[in-house]
Amino acid sequence: VKQSASQKELLGRAAVNYAESIYLAEDYLRSRGIPLEVARLAQLGVVARPEIGHEAFQGRLSIPYITKTGAVDLRFRSLNPAVEPKYMGMTGADTKMYNVLDIDKANDYIGVCEGELDTITLSACVGIPCVGVPGANSWKKHYTRLLADFERIFVFADGDQPGTEFARSLARELPVTIVQLPEGEDVNSAYVKFGVGYIREKAGLE
């Protein structure tokens, strides 16, 4: 669905507004091993003063999907594990690939994983250029074309059945190397528990 200029402007304004309050999520981000400066680079924010129509996202982490033309989507994550749903999106918004700017920054290899915070972890904390999708069932055919020129594509498979199935489905589309994470772990939890070297070694980059 093509966005109007006013929709894009609204998304951009909301992203900037929420980014000003990212300090409110400092403790949460620290628990995920993500420094505040990394969160700022990713333009993460907190919905402290909701834009009109965003009242349902009050208090959530805002995650903008940034392209060369600016913010094209916003997703919102609960900062309180007791609050469901964990993730919320804009009404009527289609799922998109996250962190597409890394496609241009990457050289001969790129990572693919589930989840925005896992993507930030790989890209900014581990040093592996990475794109992400919101969940295992969110892959689209045109994403395959976006990654077709890379010599190596690492798919980081969460340590659960959907994660394994996600990696296998991508292996049918692209020549990927599957990096299988331990049972019950995703990229971010493995990074927090085992460190940068562990993840790079799992990918064969050490």
Q: Which ranges hold each PLM region?
A:
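TOPRIM metal-binding catalytic domain and adjacent DNA-binding surface shared by DnaG-type primases
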Residues: V1-S62, T67-K68, D104-K105, G204-E206
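Phosphate-handling DNA/RNA-contact segment within nucleic-acid enzymes
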Residues: R49-E151, F166-A167
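Short, surface-exposed amphipathic charged segments that create phosphate/polyanion-binding patches used
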Residues: R60, R145-F150, N188-R200
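A charged alpha-helical hairpin associated with nucleic-acid processing machineries
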Residues: A106, I178-P182, G197-E206
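Acidic beta-strand-to-loop metal/phosphate-binding motif
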Residues: V112, F150-P162, Q180
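Short, acidic/turn-prone active-site loops that include or flank metal/cofactor-
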Residues: V133-W139, D158-Q161, L181-G184
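Short, aromatic/basic amphipathic alpha-helical patches
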Residues: E165-L174
